[in-house]
Amino acid sequence: MRTLIIYSSKTGTAKKCAALLAANLGAENCELFDINSGEPELSGFDCCAVGSYIRMGVIDKKISAFLEKRREELFNIRFGLFLCGCLEGKVSDAIVKNLKDDFLEHAACVEFFGGELHPEKYKGVEKLFVKSVLKISGKDPAFKITDRIFPESITNFAAELSAESPAD
């Protein structure tokens, strides 16, 4: 199954996760595409995985615009959505806030791949936000910090994405 993996990565974690996903799916059948390098072409692919970082509860603007603009094309192929971030307790909120119900209904899979903290890569408001969250993370379970990628989530996502749907 020929798969296009579209991602947006701010600190490198989503890019790393996209590469791990490709390895799980069989890299020879996958093409990685950074949304920041232009507009991807979906024709010629059997399925598509779209991934983004979550920053302050919001997915990347280019990924969001791509999903909206290419919704009909995505709904006509098998696709999945993955998110990367460090606030594990806020993932459900981010999914509801950023992904419309019809995307969740049509997606073969939606998964959280975890995240990695790279405080040295943040600047300004983001750096202050990260420091604030780190201070309260031990006190509020909703602000549970994740500083690792979940290989089991990537493996599960790959299995679900590559599984034959009942209609196939």
What feature does the model see in each segment?
Residues 2-27:
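N-terminal beta1-alpha1 ligand-phosphate binding loop
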Residues 6, 33, 82:
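The conserved SAM/SAH-binding core of class I Rossmann-like methyltransferase domains
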